[in-house]
Amino acid sequence: MGIVGVGIDLVSIPDFAEQVDQPGTVFAETFTPGERRDASDKSSSAARHLAARWAAKEAVIKAWSGSRFAQRPVLPEDIHRDIEVVTDMWGRPRVRLTGAIAEYLADVTIHVSLTHEGDTAAAVAILEAP
């Protein structure tokens, strides 16, 4: 297997928190019910955890885009909702894909790491293919 894409994203948690629950925001339909439930179950701010998940979605998109260097981008409009960050019972993240992006990346393993420190959330995604 080899690395075919790397993506990273940083999110300002205070800025994100202001936007995430505003009526008409794109974020209302960006997160799956599971992502919203997981974030609300945490002891700290839900916005903090959703910001890290947003960063993960963006990192996956950047890694995928980078893997298509010199090729036309193929990004479905509702791509963020098709990238879901799930966690196991110990809080370790994994990416679950649905829709068109799942078809494009069917043979790709996605490694993801999320973090938040102070006012910043971040994520790194690495795409690995056979």
From Swiss-Prot:
Q: What cofactor is needed?
A: Mg(2+)
- In which compartments does the protein localize? Cytoplasm
Give Gene Ontology CC terms: cytoplasm
The record's GO molecular-function terms, alphabetically, read: holo-[acyl-carrier-protein] synthase activity; magnesium ion binding
| Xref: InterPro entries | 4-PPantetheinyl_Trfase_dom, 4-PPantetheinyl_Trfase_dom_sf, ACPS, Ppantetheine-prot_Trfase_dom
Q: Where does CoA bind?
A: 53, 115-116
Its UniProt entry gives the catalysed reaction(s) as: apo-[ACP] + CoA = holo-[ACP] + adenosine 3',5'-bisphosphate + H(+)
Q: What's a GO biological-process term for it?
A: fatty acid biosynthetic process
Give binding positions for Mg(2+) 2.
116
Reported pH dependence: Optimum pH is between 4.4 and 6.0.
What domain of life is recorded for the organism?
Bacteria
* Additional record remark: Was identified as a high-confidence drug target.
Q: How does it assemble?
A: Homotrimer.
What functional role does this protein have?
A: Transfers the 4'-phosphopantetheine moiety from coenzyme A to a Ser of acyl-carrier-protein. Involved in the post-translational modification of Fas-I and the AcpM subunit of Fas-II.
The entry assigns this protein to a family as follows:
Belongs to the P-Pant transferase superfamily. AcpS family.
Name recorded for this polypeptide:
Holo-[acyl-carrier-protein] synthase
